[in-house]
Amino acid sequence: MNPIILKKDGKLAEITLNRPEVHNMFSMATLTRGFAEKVVTMLEKRRRNSTEIKFLCRHAF
């Protein structure tokens, strides 16, 4: 499993994924809120249980 780190204003949220192609696209990124929302949308299409992803992304900002 590979972590994705979302960073904004020094706050971090880590998302662990088991899909390498997703990890490769967003392995370490400083994200704006709009871009984070796009990431969440993209991840939801690839992972059934997206509650954890939504929670972490919302709390990263």
From Swiss-Prot:
InterPro entries assigned:
ClpP/crotonase-like_dom_sf
Q: Which domain of life is it from?
A: Archaea
State the name under which the record lists this protein. Uncharacterized protein AF_1762
**Organism of provenance:** Archaeoglobus fulgidus (strain ATCC 49558 / DSM 4304 / JCM 9628 / NBRC 100126 / VC-16)
